[in-house]
Design a protein with these regions (language model features):
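Nucleotide-activated chemistry modules centered on ATP-dependent adenylation/adenylyltransferase
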Residues: 1-226
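Acidic, low-complexity intrinsically disordered tails
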Residues: 224-234
């Protein structure tokens, strides 16, 4: 997109090449101010004066946690400090929290901020770390599955490229090791915080999106990052 801040390739990475071949993006070369200017000239006031949308488009301005509660049952449980194994608070349902989240945790903040580093959905436990131990957030590689490659020839997939692990996050330098048609091991020379299982990892060759898939597992120093108990025990 002409406006990189509004680029939607992160969300479109799973559109098949066949579908993309038949798809037009008439606004791709225009910025939002330019679109509004055109709309004003055509007397399309509702478009020209419409405010920027915020939040998730399909739920509008509603509270996201409240929206989820209408469809997904939740149960409160313990928040555990991964460094000590001690319970430091109570959560309202692990599905309402995301990796790297700092705000909205029911923990004594007099000891400084805490960060969500993981979840045990089966045991209904939310793992956190104190801000002085943020190394728990960092990984050096991840396994990505269900990749949709947007290239004519898979031999064109570069070994070295960039990846976006979250929307509007700066692109990160990575190395791709393609394991099969839809799976790749992604490693990064500099450790990255909050790479999250279930999120999309979207690959770029320069400004061109070449594909993306779902993060299946995250690693650090050859160990699965989510095996917190194993890391506590050394």
């Amino acid at each position: 997109a002409a406006d990189t801040n509004k680029d939607q390739t992160y969300f479109l990475c799973q559109v098949s090449p066949a579908a993309l071949h038949k798809t037009l993006f008439p606004l791709g070369k225009l910025t939002k101010p330019e679109v509004r200017e055109i709309a004003a000239k055509l007397n399309l006031e509702s478009v020209a004066t419409k405010k920027d949308s915020t939040g998730i488009c399909f739920i509008g301005e509603r509270n996201f946690r409240q929206f989820l509660s209408n469809y997904l049952p939740s149960q409160d449980g313990n928040i555990v400090d991964v460094d000590t194994g001690k319970v430091v608070g109570r959560h309202v349902g692990v599905l309402y929290y995301t990796i790297g989240q700092r705000k909205g945790l029911n923990i004594d903040h007099e000891k400084g901020p805490w960060f969500v580093i993981g979840k045990d959905v089966q045991k209904n436990v939310l793992f956190v770390c104190h801000h002085t131990h943020k190394e728990w957030l960092y990984s050096d590689s991840c396994l990505v599955k269900g990749i949709n490659w947007i290239v004519k020839d898979k031999n064109e997939i570069p070994e070295k490229c960039t990846c976006k692990f979250r929307y509007r996050q700066p692109d990160q330098d990575i190395y791709l090791k393609v394991l099969d048609d839809t799976t790749a091991l992604v490693s990064y020379p500099q450790k990255i915080a909050s790479v999250t299982i279930g999120q999309e990892a979207v690959f770029y060759d320069g400004f061109k999106c070449i594909g993306g898939g779902v993060i299946e597992e995250v690693y650090v120093d050859g160990k699965i990052l989510s095996t917190y108990q194993e890391r506590i025990n050394g």
